[in-house]
């Protein structure tokens, strides 16, 4: 489509013109989001060898992509928060002066789209027209980005109609950083070398510039860049929350519904929890979102959440009919797979899919693979991009423009000791304290000499806060003052990953986590037995329904205990963590820590 048919928004038209003059694409194409457009772009990529169609009998409407081996994940050390002052970026973000960064990037962007098309993608984060939604426009030279954005967000003409002539949008500029000379064709996946990759955010201007990567969160700018980094700044300024959280709906046997959000660092089973199949009779979990929640107070003083996305961008390896059957059903059709293995009959395969490796595969790098190869057939960060509407347990109100009222916020991480299976905060501020100290023990999976140490990840937002982490934690504290305390969600810290002294899991996890959710639902409804401990309210040993579960009473006691010695060590570790955030850390959090230490010292278990 041409621009004049699509929009009369002067700010948008001027910006597209200015960016095109800098990037010099061969042509500009405005995306309308139609099926016909999608098929045309897919065909373009199949013809160029970038996309492999999968077997239509096994995976209808599905395609496999292989990226360059240097372009396989988010690049945190090339991700910048270019606020006007370094102080605003804070101690946990990479900062470059915005004037300097723009000058550097303008040099890179000059002529970077030669030989390519500039695609204009108008997109809505959240249902089009929702009072909680926001509009962005991404300019990209990657058709791969267009077909993924079409799944992950709502794109096209309807978004421009909503934007109108003077609506506001977040400008997102993206280039793979690989201009083509006349007559030159791509040899595989286009991207720039690591030192030329920049994923840059200008928070005051609400602008995103990304260069040099075609992959995932670096290139699909609606996801982490907008929905978390820029949106977190908007949320701070406008009095709401943009969070790295799943959203689910739990229905009890009587038909009562409770809505819950949950923040977990990577590799803690967020998507699995969002699509949980409960093992306790009569209970049902349905998905509203698996990754991001935008939350605002409603007229009734309760916190309402929407999922700003329209799809799932999930890690494929480890996803199986055992770990997440609902995800497996979601990705049966109309799904884009990236960096997983291809079977000889045109299906996908990855480690942890639950079936034996076939005798022969084409691996994620396009090479022949056999079980004797000694390498992984799929990249550990191999992905699927699938429409949320295909999830068999998508909740009926997942696109409700008003959002859903949140009764409980879960936080968690992977901790083999110290943190119990579940405990509830005393109040909102104590819950924010728990969120500020959460994290996972560093495992051998991360290349690090810190194995056994805890990587603290406040509210699982460490890589995604668009401003100073201390101001972010203060913003959470401030949110608690904006409504009647009785209307605030209750905050629960869960840990599915406890081990005994022999390194054996104490809790079976997966669907059995519904037993913990049941207690949480009982607690928010004024029921559910609990005992007050130094760290918060803990279920009594008989409060968790263990009917039909092979977990001994001793193990349950271990899972629901406060180990004074381990917790006093934890306090020392938190002190070091807090010191690393510097002088600006909210005084309330230091006060919470001191109070915890005092309660522990007086505790006799």
From Swiss-Prot:
<keyword id="KW-0342">GTP-binding</keyword>
<comment type="pathway">
    <text>Carbohydrate biosynthesis; gluconeogenesis.</text>
</comment>
<dbReference type="GO" id="GO:0004613">
    <property type="term" value="F:phosphoenolpyruvate carboxykinase (GTP) activity"/>
</dbReference>
<feature type="binding site">
    <location>
        <position position="414"/>
    </location>
    <ligand>
        <name>GTP</name>
    </ligand>
</feature>
<dbReference type="InterPro" id="IPR008210">
    <property type="entry name" value="PEP_carboxykinase_N"/>
</dbReference>
<dbReference type="GO" id="GO:0030145">
    <property type="term" value="F:manganese ion binding"/>
</dbReference>
<feature type="active site">
    <location>
        <position position="268"/>
    </location>
</feature>
<dbReference type="GO" id="GO:0006107">
    <property type="term" value="P:oxaloacetate metabolic process"/>
</dbReference>
<feature type="binding site">
    <location>
        <begin position="510"/>
        <end position="513"/>
    </location>
    <ligand>
        <name>GTP</name>
    </ligand>
</feature>
<dbReference type="Pfam" id="PF00821">
    <property type="entry name" value="PEPCK_GTP"/>
</dbReference>
<keyword id="KW-0464">Manganese</keyword>
<dbReference type="InterPro" id="IPR008209">
    <property type="entry name" value="PEP_carboxykinase_GTP"/>
</dbReference>
<feature type="binding site">
    <location>
        <position position="266"/>
    </location>
    <ligand>
        <name>substrate</name>
    </ligand>
</feature>
<feature type="binding site">
    <location>
        <begin position="267"/>
        <end position="272"/>
    </location>
    <ligand>
        <name>GTP</name>
    </ligand>
</feature>
<dbReference type="InterPro" id="IPR035078">
    <property type="entry name" value="PEP_carboxykinase_GTP_N"/>
</dbReference>
<keyword id="KW-0210">Decarboxylase</keyword>
<dbReference type="GO" id="GO:0005829">
    <property type="term" value="C:cytosol"/>
</dbReference>
<dbReference type="GO" id="GO:0033993">
    <property type="term" value="P:response to lipid"/>
</dbReference>
<dbReference type="GO" id="GO:0005525">
    <property type="term" value="F:GTP binding"/>
</dbReference>
<comment type="similarity">
    <text>Belongs to the phosphoenolpyruvate carboxykinase [GTP] family.</text>
</comment>
<feature type="binding site">
    <location>
        <begin position="215"/>
        <end position="217"/>
    </location>
    <ligand>
        <name>substrate</name>
    </ligand>
</feature>
<dbReference type="Pfam" id="PF17297">
    <property type="entry name" value="PEPCK_N"/>
</dbReference>
<dbReference type="GO" id="GO:0042594">
    <property type="term" value="P:response to starvation"/>
</dbReference>
<dbReference type="GO" id="GO:0046327">
    <property type="term" value="P:glycerol biosynthetic process from pyruvate"/>
</dbReference>
<keyword id="KW-0456">Lyase</keyword>
<feature type="binding site">
    <location>
        <position position="291"/>
    </location>
    <ligand>
        <name>Mn(2+)</name>
    </ligand>
</feature>
<protein>
    <recommendedName>
        <fullName>Phosphoenolpyruvate carboxykinase [GTP]</fullName>
        <ecNumber>4.1.1.32</ecNumber>
    </recommendedName>
</protein>
<dbReference type="GO" id="GO:0071333">
    <property type="term" value="P:cellular response to glucose stimulus"/>
</dbReference>
<dbReference type="InterPro" id="IPR013035">
    <property type="entry name" value="PEP_carboxykinase_C"/>
</dbReference>
<feature type="binding site">
    <location>
        <begin position="381"/>
        <end position="383"/>
    </location>
    <ligand>
        <name>substrate</name>
    </ligand>
</feature>
<dbReference type="GO" id="GO:0019543">
    <property type="term" value="P:propionate catabolic process"/>
</dbReference>
<dbReference type="GO" id="GO:0006094">
    <property type="term" value="P:gluconeogenesis"/>
</dbReference>
<feature type="binding site">
    <location>
        <position position="74"/>
    </location>
    <ligand>
        <name>substrate</name>
    </ligand>
</feature>
<feature type="binding site">
    <location>
        <position position="244"/>
    </location>
    <ligand>
        <name>Mn(2+)</name>
    </ligand>
</feature>
<comment type="subunit">
    <text>Monomer.</text>
</comment>
<keyword id="KW-0312">Gluconeogenesis</keyword>
<keyword id="KW-0547">Nucleotide-binding</keyword>
<dbReference type="InterPro" id="IPR018091">
    <property type="entry name" value="PEP_carboxykin_GTP_CS"/>
</dbReference>
<dbReference type="InterPro" id="IPR035077">
    <property type="entry name" value="PEP_carboxykinase_GTP_C"/>
</dbReference>
<comment type="function">
    <text>Catalyzes the conversion of oxaloacetate (OAA) to phosphoenolpyruvate (PEP), the rate-limiting step in the metabolic pathway that produces glucose from lactate and other precursors derived from the citric acid cycle.</text>
</comment>
<feature type="binding site">
    <location>
        <position position="224"/>
    </location>
    <ligand>
        <name>Mn(2+)</name>
    </ligand>
</feature>
<keyword id="KW-0963">Cytoplasm</keyword>
